[in-house]
Amino acid sequence: METLKSNKARLEYLINDMRRERNDNDVLVMPSSFEDLWELYRGLANVRPALPVSDEYLAVQDAMLSDLNHQHVTDLKDLKPIKGDNIFVWQGDITTLKIDAIVNAANSRFLGCMQANHDCIDNIIHTKAGVQVRLDCAEIIRQQGRNEGVGKAKKTRGYNLPAKYIIHTVGPQIRRLPVSKMNQDLLAKCYLSCLKLADQHSLNHVAFCCISTGVFAFPQDEAAEIAVRTVESYLKETNSTLKVVFNVFTDKDLQLYKEALNRDAE
């Protein structure tokens, strides 16, 4: 049973456990600040392969992450819709949102970002949810026998996040402009696949990150238009009661989504 009382002590335990696993016997002076300890832990967790972990590790990790992740939670019930009763735009950290599901912009290997301390959404979601998500994703890939295709959607538990589930989708990667019709359609398919999966599992609400607009380089304005158009068409054509949150992080994306929703209303 997990008995460590502070998150700093938990971080030190997890760091030492992962270093032992790597046969890292170099002398390490533990950082004194929580922030530096977190960065060390996060980097090790990011690069750790999808291998089994001990019950003790999980207990310590879950106690720490659950505590940290529930300190600053935004509940969907506290948000006001921007259009109708079921479309929301919210600026903030998607990993703090209490909701049925959040959408993760994954890569085709489907194991989460394995670059230490990288600030992509895939890295942040996996880090804050816990190692179990990587293990679940690895099992999905093992069962299907191939990398994840662009435009599909798979569901895992949210584990230590306020969100109950994570829906993972691989968006198109843009290598040249203008964006091709094929890649526009693939991005729309990402949103459609996530919406269908949410309804298939009787979820009440889902929050989308800005799929493909980070390192995958989809232009933000085009992506916002496609996201809004696809979601609104789906809700109208299926009569779905699903509540949809467009989660944005930057001021630019916030403005783009507001403009896209206003244009669609004209």
UniProtKB/Swiss-Prot annotation:
Binding site for Zn(2+): 113, 118, 120
Disulfide bonds: none
Entry EC number(s): 3.2.1.-
Residue ranges constituting the Macro domain according to the UniProt record: 74-265
Effect of residue 214 to E: Decreases hydrolase activity with GcvH-L as substrate. Does not affect zinc binding
Residue positions binding ADP-D-ribose: 93-94, 107, 120-122, 212-214, 216
Effect of residue 93 to R: No effect on hydrolase activity with GcvH-L as substrate. Does not affect zinc binding
Known catalytic reactions: 4-O-(ADP-D-ribosyl)-L-aspartyl-[protein] + H2O = L-aspartyl-[protein] + ADP-D-ribose + H(+)
Family, as annotated: Belongs to the MacroD-type family. Zn-Macro subfamily.
Identification of the protein by name: Protein-ADP-ribose hydrolase
Organism the protein comes from: Staphylococcus aureus (strain Mu50 / ATCC 700699)
